[in-house]
């Protein structure tokens, strides 16, 4: 999404409109009072973690991630379209890749998290209806399978 350039709200002292790609934050904005100054942005927030194990099958841990999208545009139609475009481009990229991860200690890329799409775990996308113009926001809920934790030994947690 680095190539998606959107307008930034003009601040006191600005003489011309600035543009940039959405910034990405984990869990929350660094300064929640500056939410309007930070637009456009995406915040990824981890919400409930759920581990289950069906008899005779592997343990499965799924985490939900709420991605909150925000953009600015002085034109109402352009603002709504910019938000929908930002959310749709993100959704399409997720569906193309379906796996995310990091770099291991050996320098190789590791796919640690797999997108889960099933009747109980849908990819949901909702633009907010509130009248917040010239700011536009929405959210997407995704579910991710975490790596299985291999039990290596029996330990007593409470002695």
Language model regions located:
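Extracellular/virion structural assembly segments
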Residues: 56-62, 71-98
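Short, solvent-exposed beta-strand/turn "edge" segments of beta-rich domains on protein surfaces
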Residues: 35-36, 52-60, 129-135
């Amino acid at each position: 999404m680095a190539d998606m350039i959107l307008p930034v709200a003009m601040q006191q002292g600005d003489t011309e409109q600035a543009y940039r790609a959405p910034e990405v934050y984990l869990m929350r904005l660094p300064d929640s009072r500056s939410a309007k100054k930070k637009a456009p942005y995406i915040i990824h927030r981890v919400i409930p973690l759920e581990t289950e194990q069906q008899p005779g099958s592997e343990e499965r841990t799924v985490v939900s991630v709420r991605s909150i999208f925000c953009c600015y545009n002085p034109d109402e139609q352009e603002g709504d379209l910019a938000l929908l475009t930002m959310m749709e481009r993100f959704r399409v990229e997720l569906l193309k890749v379906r796996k995310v991860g990091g770099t291991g200690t050996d320098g190789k890329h590791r796919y640690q998290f797999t997108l889960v799409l099933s009747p109980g775990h849908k990819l949901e996308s909702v633009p907010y209806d509130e009248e917040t113009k010239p700011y536009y926001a929405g959210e997407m809920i995704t579910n991710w399978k975490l790596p299985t934790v291999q039990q290596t030994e029996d330990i007593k947690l409470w002695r």
